[in-house]
Amino acid sequence: MAQDRKKVLVLGAGYAGLQTVTKLQKAISTEEAEITLINKNEYHYEATWLHEASAGTLNYEDVLYPVESVLKKDKVNFVQAEVTKIDRDAKKVETNQGIYDFDILVVALGFVSETFGIEGMKDHAFQIENVITARELSRHIEDKFANYAASKEKDDNDLSILVGGAGFTGVEFLGELTDRIPELCSKYGVDQNKVKITCVEAAPKMLPMFSEELVNHAVSYLEDRGVEFKIATPIVACNEKGFVVEVDGEKQQLNAGTSVWAAGVRGSKLMEESFEGVKRGRIVTKQDLTINGYDNIFVIGDCSAFIPAGEERPLPTTAQIAMQQGESVAKNIKRILNGESTEEFEYVDRGTVCSLGSHDGVGMVFGKPIAGKKAAFMKKVIDTRAVFKIGGIGLAFKKGKF
């Protein structure tokens, strides 16, 4: 019987991959399949909390937990390694720690920052990408305040922060910044009126997923707390001084001691090397989340471009969608092991909340708009639920937001 066990290989321990494994380990016996999870880090991090760690309102250590803490060691083999190649036809995955065979493969390799080719953005701006970049950014911001306080010749740029992007990540980061700045000013004896936070967005509207009423609430709240918005203002370059923007056809230099890019992500760059038809690290999947020509390969999370039946555009890359995809794939792997056909993935939209710091927010929950403290509370519920869904009540109690 042991020789008949299928090899299930899962790449990535983000929301999608880890949800797949934690659901699958409960659904199958050790005789049915050998499950291997490969992740480049020994920890999982809550990607939707990175804006907090980046601003310094949450310690970076609170954003992560060991992958093995949520695994059943008798059912799942965890390998800390970096994937270097996926060979679909040979059913092999190459890593820096060896080669792994598979019968069923789940690709959930996550996201990296996308700068859209803007000159200098990768070199001169901080990215909100992982716990390492979050730690670097939060420390850099505090170092700038400390330097300003200690310097005899004050440089106002030390207290100036530029944020590129007024989408979800950018706005949530701005909200956390407005919570963090008063603490830093108090700690280092800095006049808060000297702090300058500017958000630059190329699109004509911020938070395009929300109504004008909710957007206006977010803008008013953040402006009241010191944020200046430059909407419909493309960033054409980034340098050591800050952003270069285009206004009425002319280039302008915006100066700041801290530049942050929060305007785009893409799927893993390994996707282009491993599959055809990949755009920005995402591949269009079939309705059961497998890919054309390979019924044994599932692609989920940030690497997946899932277009619901009857729709024209793929679903966005969110933690909620990734976790639902993980659940669906776990069920389908169980069905495959039972000799049954797979079922189509059906996304249930439970709503979206954008935090504006720890005390305010905007969102749509079950089709109804919410704002203010109610939205902030709901965001904490959503964050805690995500931890609970993967790690159970113990992890939710330890890492949750309550």
Curated annotation (Swiss-Prot):
One Pfam family hit: Pyr_redox_2
Function: Alternative, nonproton pumping NADH:quinone oxidoreductase that delivers electrons to the respiratory chain by oxidation of NADH and reduction of quinones, and contributes to the regeneration of NAD(+). Can use DMN, a menaquinone analog, 2,3-dimethoxy-5,6-dimethyl-benzoquinone (DDB), an ubiquinone analog, or 2,3,5,6-tetramethyl-1,4-benzoquinone (Duroquinone, DQ) a plastoquinone analog as electron acceptors.
GO cellular component, one term: plasma membrane
Family to which this protein belongs: Belongs to the NADH dehydrogenase family.
Comment, domains: Contains a first dinucleotide binding domain, which harbors FAD, a second dinucleotide binding domain, which interacts with NADH and C-terminal domain that provides anchoring to the membrane. A long discussion has taken place about whether NADH and the quinone bind to the same or to different sites. Structural studies clearly indicate the presence of distinct binding sites for the two substrates.
Highest taxon above the source species: Bacteria
Protein name: Type II NADH:quinone oxidoreductase
Main enzyme class: oxidoreductase
Cofactor descriptive note: Binds 1 FAD per subunit.
Effect ascribed to mutating residue 172 to Q: 12-fold decrease in kcat for DMN. Decreases the overall affinity for NAD(+) and the quinone
EC number per UniProt: 1.6.5.9
Positions with a binding annotation for FAD: 12-16, 39-40, 83, 302, 319-320, 379
SUPFAM superfamilies, sorted: FAD/NAD(P)-binding domain (SSF51905)
UniProt keywords, alphabetically: Cell membrane, FAD, Flavoprotein, Membrane, NAD, Oxidoreductase
One of the GO biological process terms: aerobic electron transport chain
MF annotations from Gene Ontology: NAD(P)H dehydrogenase (quinone) activity; NADH:ubiquinone reductase (non-electrogenic) activity
